[in-house]
């Protein structure tokens, strides 16, 4: 997207979510202008020096925020909703917030392995007992962090489940599909 926008002579600025802030009801970011892009190099972006920009004056903002879907993620979506209507936010902030990926895919549950989303430990244990082998992970996690393969006889079964539930969010438990490693 950046490559095509540069070809069309758009000015592109990038910033991280940590660098987005609201000051006196004006949305700003600590950002850098992209000067060049070379996807064949390890350091593929050439940037100007980072500086504070007022996002109210931009025509488009493209949200490309990776999970985890946490309070920082949610806050960023609320902040981006402060932009004036004259600024088009692509990947609408409220739509992103309202459609977390692991819940949204439940619209296609008929294409998924048996799945449980819960914080109720006895329901989770019953699900594990029923399917023998499962994968359990935080509902709003990312990058493979805190993903566990469990079987009903795992000596650490309860400890792992309790540890995941101690983080105050639901978990997603799915029947383990052996062929998953083949895509």
Regions found by a protein language model. Give the residues of each.
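Phosphate-binding site of ATP-dependent enzymes
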Residues: 121-122, 129-133, 140-183
